[in-house]
């Protein structure tokens, strides 16, 4: 009975994370494309060390490049983890839940790294509305990924205990 509750909560959280990570990918991809297109003209007026630096974005502040790159990586990994996690949750056996738990933990670690850059970007300021949206969604998805990781770990331990009790 308890594993059914964990299964439904994990499915809902994985579906929510799938949507949130897709939004993160779309906004971070737009920001990356915008930065690549505008960096040549914006960086031409800078001094030599700043022109050579490959992670210069004409919007935001000095953490914007790192924030966008790590958010894009976390978004792609999180989207993939959510898709495979839904498959693993629907099968609901120990090996699949262990795989879902480990990939969920890895995704949460990457999302926390992106969230750290989001917090630094918020602290420094000077960001436009698109970057503020990406920062907020990154912070929200790190919290939902923590909940999802916790629920999957609870479900994996329940299935393992049930398997041990049967033997």
Regions picked out by a protein language model, each given a short descriptive name:
Residues 1-14, 23, 34-55, 126-167:
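Intrinsically disordered terminal tails
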Residues 119-123:
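Juxtamembrane "helix-exit" motif on the non-cytosolic side of transmembrane helices
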Residues 101-104, 125, 129:
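Short amphipathic alpha-helical interaction segments
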Residues 3-24, 28, 60-118, 135-155:
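Signature of small four-pass
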């Amino acid at each position: 009975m308890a594993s059914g509750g964990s299964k439904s909560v994990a499915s809902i959280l994985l579906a929510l994370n799938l949507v949130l990570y897709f939004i993160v990918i779309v906004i971070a991809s737009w920001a990356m494309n915008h930065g690549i297109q505008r960096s040549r003209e914006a960086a031409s007026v800078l001094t030599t060390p700043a022109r050579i630096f490959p992670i210069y974005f004409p919007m935001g502040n000095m953490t914007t490049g790192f924030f966008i790159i790590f958010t894009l990586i976390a978004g792609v990994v999180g989207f993939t983890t959510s898709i495979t996690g839904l498959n693993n949750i629907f099968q609901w056996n120990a090996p699949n839940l262990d795989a879902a738990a480990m990939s969920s933990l890895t995704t949460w670690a990457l999302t926390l790294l992106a969230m750290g850059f989001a917090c630094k970007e918020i602290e420094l300021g000077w960001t436009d509305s698109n970057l503020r949206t990406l920062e907020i969604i990154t912070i929200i998805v790190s919290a939902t990924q923590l909940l999802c990781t916790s629920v999957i770990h609870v479900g994996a331990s329940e299935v393992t205990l049930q398997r041990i009790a049967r033997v």
